[in-house]
Structure formats: C-alpha cells, structure tokens
Amino acid sequence: SAPLILGNDIRKFLKEDGSVDKNNETLRIVSNKKAIEIDSDPLGVQCRREKTNGLCDVLVKPLSDNRLAVCLFNKGCVTQTASFNVTELADNEYVTLPKSHRYKFLDVWENCEFVSDGAVSEAVGKHAVKLYIIESADTAKNGE
C-alpha cells in the first residue's frame, strides 16, 4: 500500500563491531514481518480512521483473504483506553471481513493470538500503538 519510510539514523541498528543489533527496539518494529505484511497487502486498500476520542484513534485497513487490520493509536501523553467492536466494523461496506460469532485476533507486536466475540477494549500506552490482524474464527486458515 505504501513504502515504509524511515526518519531515523539507521546506523543505530548496528553494534560497534558492525553487526546488526537485534535488540534494537526500532529495528524490531520496522522489520516486523506481520506489520510489513499489513503494509504490503495485495488488496492495496489504505486504512481509515473509524473512531477517535481526539487522543486515541481506531484505524481500520481491509486486507486480502477477508481479513482486517486494526490499529489503536494513542497520540496522547498518558495511557488511554481504546475500544472497538469487530461486528460493528464488519457492517461497514469498506470492510471485507465477514460477520462472525467469533473472531481470531493476532496481536502483531506480541505475536500472540486470541479469540473474541469482537468486543475489544485495550489500554494503549502513551505515544504507542496496538496492532491486530483479525479474521473470522469460523473461516480461519489451516482449519484453526
């Protein structure tokens, strides 16, 4: 959908001996394979802001294979609680995710999965994001 543009000093991704610093937090973020998958999804649809309270946005991006990416983006200086309901998002004609009784969530940063009826409420740290790839638990890949 868009190139990933870095505005930081990439030399800081290296240790003094010239090897890659795999513990560098910024490098781990920009090289996260699932985040790159969201950015380069073949559906090619941009994200939209679906909800905001002024400090915390809920950003939604339809993905190929009837999946959905949701980003909770806290622009504030204190932790904010952000909430959304996948079932309500699935009502939006912009969203390709089918309605379901249960949804499978992949937390992109934590690399963990959970199943929910679609209602999500999360504490998002200051100047932080939570990022999910969501699909119907009824139609999840690999027979899950």
In which residue ranges do the predicted regions lie?
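Active-site-proximal substrate-binding groove within the catalytic cores of carbohydrate-active enzymes
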Residues: 1-107, 122-131, 135-138
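Short beta-strand and strand-turn-strand segments in soluble, beta-rich domains
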Residues: 107-116
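Mature N-terminal, pre-catalytic/accessory segment of carbohydrate-active enzymes
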Residues: 138-144
